[in-house]
Design a protein with these regions (language model features):
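Hydrophobic alpha-helical membrane segments
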Residues: 130-152, 169
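Cytosolic juxtamembrane helix and N-cap/initiation of the first transmembrane helix
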Residues: 13-62
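Juxtamembrane membrane-interface segments at transmembrane-helix boundaries in membrane proteins
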Residues: 34-45, 78-102
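Terminal transmembrane helical module of multi-pass membrane proteins
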Residues: 156-202
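Generic alpha-helical transmembrane segments
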Residues: 93-116, 134-140
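Non-transmembrane, juxtamembrane loop and terminal tail segments
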Residues: 1-32, 185-202
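Interhelical loop segments of eukaryotic multi-pass membrane proteins
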Residues: 68-91, 183-196
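Juxtamembrane "helix-exit" motif on the non-cytosolic side of transmembrane helices
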Residues: 68-72, 119-122, 147-156
Length: 202
């Protein structure tokens, strides 16, 4: 049977890391485990970046084009036929301006949250976290504004309007959770690597 290759005595490594547990894997095997864990987290990060990033940005662009451009800027019958504005139909310039603000905030929430996930592909974890927070703020503002409009504008605030108003905040929270989980996983890999190779300085 071929002997395991040990580049550094395990007792020296364990003493340096204050590890009193029984050694199961040698250094080469542990290195392969770390590499497999790193490859797995990187694959998950790429999937989250591609799926949530592209979907969020697309939702923001489509939302703005279908609802904000056609509804808020069209006026008249186009306004009434807008898919979402049928549920929040209001009259008056000030009310329409408020709905336009809701549209802008919703589009910003979808786009910023998607952009935060898209930034996971690189190493800009701090930038992804900050962008996700901005998207979450926009989502909360948009949802609260839609709910306020449902009560103040149309006067018919039911379960349907509540769920539709909650959509921007729910999407932003989901993306923020994905970003946080992926960033924590990436940092866990870095911490594990630093502990694994701490014995190199002995």
């Amino acid at each position: 049977m071929r002997r395991r290759r040990r580049e550094t005595p395990r007792d020296v490594i364990d003493a340096a890391l204050n590890d009193a547990n029984e050694t199961v894997l040698d250094e080469c095997e542990q290195s392969r485990v770390v590499q497999a864990f790193e490859a797995s987290t990187a694959a998950q990060r790429r999937f989250a970046s591609a799926f949530f990033g592209s979907l969020g940005i697309s939702l923001g662009v489509v939302y703005f084009g279908a609802h904000c451009a056609c509804g808020a800027f069209g006026g008249g019958d186009v306004w009434a036929r807008s898919l979402l504005h049928r549920w929040y139909y209001v009259e008056g310039a000030r009310a329409r301006a408020f709905v336009t603000m809701c549209d802008w905030a919703s589009a910003a929430a979808y786009s910023a949250s998607g952009l935060a996930c898209a930034r996971l592909r690189g190493d800009a974890y701090g930038g992804a976290t900050a962008t996700a927070r901005a998207g979450l703020v926009c989502g909360v503002v948009a949802s609260c504004a839609w709910w306020a409009l449902g009560v103040w504008g149309s006067g018919t605030f039911d379960a349907g309007s509540a769920s539709r108003g909650a959509a921007p905040a729910a999407w932003a929270w989901t993306c923020a959770h994905v970003v946080r989980a992926q960033v924590d996983a990436a940092r866990a890999v870095e911490t594990l690597r630093s502990k694994m190779y701490a014995h190199k300085s002995l």
